[in-house]
């Protein structure tokens, strides 16, 4: 019989529940698992998770801090038994990567609004992950969707614009929500001009 552990993780474990939030599920397996729907589960092999723990990967920290065991084939708590992940040391390179994603998406949306929802979604991902990786590098990780507003200094952005970015993310990843209108795209583009300076300032607080 196949060894398997199932965990819930993410927003539901933070109590961040709203119409757009999904239940994130992790399935840990020791071999091929064709019966598990990859649309519904993040599927990881045990050795891959052990490797992520060993390198102090942000996803390992996320699971360590915000997951709940739902099912265990052998009564053990696999993630719990892995203990505390290694120290996160990739803050600089990860933040540089997300800054680049932001810059590229911002350029793309200014040139053409064809795939604007996708570009806004990437900008949201970049800003959120930048803040999360920064907070993790300081040793007090914030995995919330609103992490850019919870770090110090926070991103000074109009709440309406931030909600447009969040909606774009939900539309792109879950196909959920109201389509984003031209005037909303314009609002978002105008408001995110503050992002590059914020990113630079945030990383100087180390």
Task: Place the predicted regions along the sequence by residue.
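A structural signal for short, well-ordered beta-strand segments
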Residues: 23-25
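Catalytic core of pol beta-like nucleotidyltransferases
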Residues: 1-3, 13-19, 28-206
């Amino acid at each position: 019989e196949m060894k398997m552990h199932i965990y819930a993780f993410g927003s539901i474990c933070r109590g961040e529940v709203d119409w757009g939030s999904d239940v994130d599920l992790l399935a840990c397996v020791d071999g091929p698992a064709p019966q598990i729907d990859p649309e519904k589960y993040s599927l990881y092999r045990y050795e891959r998770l052990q490797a992520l723990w060993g390198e102090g990967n942000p996803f390992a920290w996320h699971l360590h801090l915000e997951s709940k065991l739902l099912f265990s084939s052998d009564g053990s708590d696999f993630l719990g038994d892995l203990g505390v992940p290694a120290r996160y040391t990739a803050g600089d390179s990860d933040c540089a990567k997300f800054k680049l994603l932001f810059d590229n998406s911002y350029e793309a949306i200014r040139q053409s609004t064809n795939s604007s929802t996708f570009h806004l979604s990437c900008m949201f991902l970049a800003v959120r992950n930048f803040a999360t990786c920064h907070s993790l590098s300081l040793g007090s990780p914030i995995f919330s969707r609103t992490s850019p507003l919870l770090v110090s200094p926070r991103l000074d952005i109009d709440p309406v614009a931030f909600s447009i970015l969040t909606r774009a993310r939900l539309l792109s990843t879950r196909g959920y929500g109201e389509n984003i209108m031209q005037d909303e795209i314009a609002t978002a583009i105008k408001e995110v001009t503050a992002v590059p300076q914020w990113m630079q300032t945030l990383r100087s607080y180390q």
